[in-house]
Amino acid sequence: MKPIFVPSAGPGDWQRFLADPERHWVSGRSAKTLAHCWEGAEGFPPEVLAVLAQAPAFKNITPLFIVPEWKVPLPGGSTESQSDAWVLAKSESGLVSITVEGKVEESFDKPLGEWKTKASPGKITRLEYLADVLGLSHPIPDTIHYQLLHRTASAVIEANRFGATHAAMLVHSFSPTNQWFTEFKDFVALSAQRRLSENSAQ
C-alpha cells in the first residue's frame, strides 16, 4: 500500500477499497452503513465520541485523519488485516491509533476452534504473533473470534509504527439487537484477565 492518500468526496469513495466492492457494498450492511455514518459526521460520529470520552486517556480526543479499509500486514501468510477504517487521533495524553470495525448483523469471523481446524504452519505462526502483540497467554480460548484478535493487534501495530501513546479497537455496531455483543464481551474479558495478571505480578 502506497503512503499516498487522497481526500474523500463522499461515502461512495469507500467502495473501491473493499476486498469485494460489488458484493460488500450493500445497503443495510456494515461497509456502506459505516461509510455513510462517518462521512456524515464532523470528526467522530457522536455515539463513537461518547464512548471514547469515557476513557481518561482519550480526553478531548479528535481525529487527525481517517483512512477507509486500512491494511496491516501480518506474518504467517499473504492475507492482511483489513479494518473498515483506521483513525490516527490526538488526545490530551498523546496520539491514539484506532482500528474501526463496523457491524450490522455480521459475525467476527470464525471462533478460533473452527479457524484452527487443520491449521497450516502459517496459521500457527500468525496466532502466536497475535497473542504476543496483545500480551495474551497461550493457548487463547477456542471460543474467542479470530477477527477480534487481528483487528486489535492491528491497532497496536500501527500505534508502534506511528509513535502513538495509545491503541484501541472500536466496534461500531448498527445492530438493533446487539448481535454478537456476547462474543465481544468475552474478548474484552480475556483482555481484562491479562491486565489483572499483570497487576498481580507487580
Which residues does each PLM region occupy?
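Short, low-complexity, polybasic intrinsically disordered segments
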Residues: 171-202
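Short catalytic/ligand-binding loop motif for oxyanion handling, primarily in non-cytosolic enzymes
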Residues: 94, 106-110, 160, 177-180
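Active-site beta-strand-loop-beta-strand hairpin of nuclease catalytic cores
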Residues: 87-99
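Short, solvent-exposed loop/turn segments at secondary-structure junctions
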Residues: 71-72, 103-107, 174-177
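Extended hydrophobic secondary-structure segments that form protein cores and membrane-embedded regions
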Residues: 99-101, 168-174
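Acidic-basic catalytic patches of nuclease active cores, encompassing PD-(D/E)XK
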Residues: 1-77, 90-93
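Acidic, metal/cofactor-coordinating or nucleic-acid-engaging core segments within structured domains
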Residues: 108-169
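Conserved beta-strand->loop/alpha-helix structural units within folded catalytic cores of enzymes
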Residues: 82-86, 102
